[in-house]
């Protein structure tokens, strides 16, 4: 048997490395082998251990602890019931069962550090097919047939960008992978690089062949050390096997590849800002035109796509563009990967065909909302996206339908919110992020987001004024019309969508000085119900501000002047005696 421990960043953070070490100490007692894999996407169940027998998955064990190693060894030694208590439930199996995986097809299956495991799953066969039987024009046509659009957020046709770079005059051309995944709560690209780096390399090589580039660069944020480490090893192995470098596969095509670690600036997700950073300059967007296809890296013709876009390419070449186009909707083909996070039961990586609804993802795959709470909204597209309310849960997931709601597909962030989430505070959070991440080049983004944030800060503190909502809307449209790049133009989206769908919450904050979600501390008042209080003194002992007084077995009181509204009393009271209004 083969024991496989999931060691993506999520698994390691949950303790997978310790689980691996515990099993390693005992594995000698069996005839089994022990290896690692990347993230299969079920982050809510990490650490995960899979047990294979003859290539067939026999057991998937979840939330495994180091002390469970003895159970695992007992199972592989013949005790069929040894791991029953840590085996995945039938309900949680639905998380993967209801997905369609193309970009993530190898994630959590192969060892990302061993190239032979990738080639065993048809790895580099697409590259071989391209070099042996297809011209660059053939490749671009196949991508056109597939309908593959850029998965970084803009949804621009991939074939069009490749063709523009192909047609540009110049001896030197560059292919660049944008792995600068900066959206809060997004981890799709990180998982692909950590779990299936050779798929990224193969997709990039096919793209380089198509546009005529002899050098490829992966721009990845420095905050992804494991992804960088595994990608470096994958590049080294690909070079040793003749899949990368000079005269690839003996077919006369040469392309070298290197990694550039970025400093983590959100604006460097914008392609021209990324290029500036690659050149050693401050990451600030360039004016377009010219576009990178005409004048990009070092002012040479360049093509930029993100990780997920490249991760689809080898599958399309092997299976045909028509097979990819058969999935999805008329305007949005294929599958899309989402990072499902927030107040959700089953959070992790989800890949579904375009055309599924938000309800399909959040409730059928994600299992619905934690702790019996009600679904309130979902934030799509990160800081550049928008909030979609519960009555639009049946919105189809494609570029046009999501755009009609005021949100965007984005790179794939999907943050789920329940009834305890304040939408004004949510807008404040995302605007605070974009204001800090603004490169400062244009006034609309640099100053406009700051003024908007000042208004939101006042509102959540109970200092909102009549006319603030209208002023926010005016600033939003001014920034959208005047900002230079996509970051600035989309920065107002979280504010606009929360005003559109949750205007009543803004009005409650401004007019009534109340937070309907009971989330904004400055608008809350803590009191103790004398009839329910048992005088156990636990709340008084836990209060960091010494704001609670009272005798043992007598009703306690909260001093409003001292109360810092931290919520400690609510969390420790076993009798529901603390009221929050």
Model-derived features with residue positions:
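Short amphipathic, charge-patterned alpha-helical segments
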Residues: 203-205, 354-370
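Gly-rich Lys/Arg/Thr-decorated short loops/hinges at beta-loop-alpha junctions or inter-strand turns
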Residues: 110, 115-125, 175-189, 292-298, ...
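C-terminal accessory/binding modules appended to enzymatic or scaffolding proteins
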Residues: 334-346, 352-354, 358, 516-560, ...
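Ferredoxin-type iron-sulfur electron-transfer modules in oxidoreductases and energy-metabolism complexes
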Residues: 1, 16-36, 53-78, 126-143, ...
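Iron-sulfur cluster-binding cysteine motifs and their immediate structural context
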Residues: 47-51, 444-450, 538-557, 568-581
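Hydrophobic alpha-helical positions that pack around
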Residues: 228-354, 366
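Conserved phosphate/anionic-ligand binding catalytic regions in large, soluble enzymes, centered on
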Residues: 7-12, 144-165, 264-276, 435-447, ...
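Flexible inter-domain linker/hinge segments
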Residues: 84-145, 305-320
């Amino acid at each position: 048997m083969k024991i496989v421990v999931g060691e993506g960043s999520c698994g390691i953070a949950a303790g997978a490395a310790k689980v691996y070490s515990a099993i390693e100490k005992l594995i000698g007692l069996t005839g089994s082998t022990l290896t690692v894999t990347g993230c299969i996407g079920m982050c809510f169940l990490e650490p995960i251990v899979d047990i294979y027998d003859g290539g067939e998955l026999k057991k998937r064990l979840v939330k495994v602890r180091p002390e469970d190693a003895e159970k695992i060894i007992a199972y592989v030694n013949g005790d069929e019931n040894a791991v029953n208590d840590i085996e995945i439930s039938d309900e949680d199996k639905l998380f993967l069962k209801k997905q369609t995986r193309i970009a993530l097809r190898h994630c959590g299956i192969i060892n990302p550090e061993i190239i032979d495991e990738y080639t065993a799953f048809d790895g580099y066969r697409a590259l071989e097919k391209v070099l042996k039987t297809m011209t660059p024009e053939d490749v671009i046509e196949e991508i056109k047939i597939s309908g593959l659009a850029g998965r970084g957020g803009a949804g621009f046709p991939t074939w069009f960008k490749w063709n523009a770079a192909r047609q540009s005059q110049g001896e030197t051309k560059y292919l660049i992978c944008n792995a600068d995944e900066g959206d809060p709560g997004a981890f799709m690209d990180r998982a692909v690089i950590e779990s299936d780096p050779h798929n990224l390399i193969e997709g990039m090589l096919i793209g380089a062949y198509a546009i005529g580039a002899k050098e490829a660069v992966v721009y990845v944020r420095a905050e992804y050390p494991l992804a960088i480490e595994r990608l470096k090893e994958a590049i080294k192995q690909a070079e040793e096997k003749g899949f990368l470098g000079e005269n690839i596969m003996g077919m006369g095509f040469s392309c070298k590849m290197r990694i550039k670690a970025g400093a983590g600036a959100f604006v460097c997700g914008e392609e021209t800002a990324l290029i500036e950073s690659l050149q050693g300059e401050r990451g600030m967007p360039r004016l377009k035109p010219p576009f990178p296809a005409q004048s990009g890296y070092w002012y040479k013709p360049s093509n930029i796509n993100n990780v997920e876009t490249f991760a689809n390419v080898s599958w399309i070449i092997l299976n045909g563009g028509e097979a990819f186009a058969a999935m999805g909707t008329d305007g949005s083909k294929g599958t899309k990967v989402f990072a499902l996070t927030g107040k959700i039961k089953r959070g992790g990586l989800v890949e579904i065909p375009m055309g599924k609804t938000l309800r399909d993802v959040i409730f059928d795959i994600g299992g619905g909302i934690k702790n019996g709470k009600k679904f309130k909204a979902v934030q799509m597209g990160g800081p550049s996206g928008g909030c979609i309310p519960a009555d639009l849960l049946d919105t189809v997931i494609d570029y046009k339908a999501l755009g009609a709601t005021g949100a965007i597909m984005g790179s794939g962030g999907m943050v789920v919110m329940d009834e305890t989430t304040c939408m004004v505070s949510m807008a404040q959070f995302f605007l605070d992020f974009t204001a800090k991440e603004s490169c400062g080049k244009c006034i609309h983004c640099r100053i406009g987001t700051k003024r908007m944030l000042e208004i939101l800060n006042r509102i959540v503190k109970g200092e909102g004024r009549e006319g603030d909502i209208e002023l926010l809307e005016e600033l939003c449209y001014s920034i959208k019309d005047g900002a230079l790049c996509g970051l600035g133009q989309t920065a107002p989206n979280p504010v606009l969508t929360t005003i559109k769908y949750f205007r009543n919450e803004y009005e409650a904050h401004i007019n009534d000085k109340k937070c309907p979600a009971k989330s904004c501390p400055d608008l809350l008042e803590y009191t103790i119900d004398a009839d329910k209080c048992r005088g156990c003194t636990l709340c008084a002992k836990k209060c960091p501000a010494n704001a609670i007084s009272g005798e043992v077995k007598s009703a306690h009181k909260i001093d409003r002047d001292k109360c810092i509204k931290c919520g400690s009393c609510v969390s420790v009271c076993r009798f529901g005696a603390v009221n929050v209004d």
